Amino acid sequence: MTGSGHKKPSRSPSGRSPSGRSPQARTAARLAAVQALYQMDMTGIDLTHVIAEFEAHRLGQEVEGSQYCDAEAQFFRDIVEGVVREQRRIDPLVDRHLAEGWRLNRVDSILRAILRAGAYEMLMRKDVPSRVVITEYVDLAHAFFEGEEPKVVNGILDKLGHEERPQEFARQGSGGA
């Protein structure tokens, strides 16, 4: 789970957004949230400072010659704040679905951030369909990893979705497209 190394994001995850919001803005918010969670994990920067830094200097800004996409700032804040607030609930749920002998604190930091953010959305953002949560975070994993990590993200979020939102999966399996 940790041996494939990172690659720079080469593509944007495909986003879908309810309420007429730009799918790209939600996708950009998810990417920024994963980056912020990673930064907090690696540097120990606190929640208030990382959110302020991202909102002032990254979301929709040009950084080192790269243009950051406009992100839905409120959605970004909700994910980052929510992961921090719900981490004691999220981590054991993710741990339960990792391969035997693995714990969340042993996986790669970016993968850990992706899993936490995806689990938060699956648990707390019922306005976002589970299939969208899974697709978005699998696409994010593909942007950072070339190995098995996207499959890990897919498997864990799918299991969480079946546990937390069984009605969505029951509807999907009953004669739909």
Please identify what each model-predicted range represents:
Residues 1-177:
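N-terminal interaction/assembly modules
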